[in-house]
């Protein structure tokens, strides 16, 4: 069994990577908003969001993971929309 400190250090490293990826994703979100504004498309696209969630969860058998991934990405998409509207 690994030491708790070692496990927490690994989690901290993963969190830093996730933060960097989130910032990168938000940068892409700005580009999406610019494109949508330039082409007259709506910021909110519920069909696209549902397709994205379905694609991310389709191969996951464990229900708690599937629901957690869905919740996490729905929240990220909500944050992304707010970012795009600003």
Label each region the model flagged.
Residues 1-86:
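Domain-level signature for soluble enzymes in the chorismate/prephenate branch of the shikimate pathway
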């Amino acid at each position: 069994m690994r030491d708790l400190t070692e496990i927490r250090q690994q989690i901290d490293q993963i969190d830093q990577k996730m933060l960097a990826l989130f910032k990168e994703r938000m940068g892409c979100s700005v580009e999406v908003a610019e494109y949508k504004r330039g082409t007259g498309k709506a910021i909110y696209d519920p069909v696209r969001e549902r397709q994205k969630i379905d694609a991310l969860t389709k191969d996951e058998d464990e229900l708690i993971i599937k629901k957690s991934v869905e919740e996490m990405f729905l929240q990220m998409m909500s944050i992304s929309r707010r970012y795009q509207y600003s």
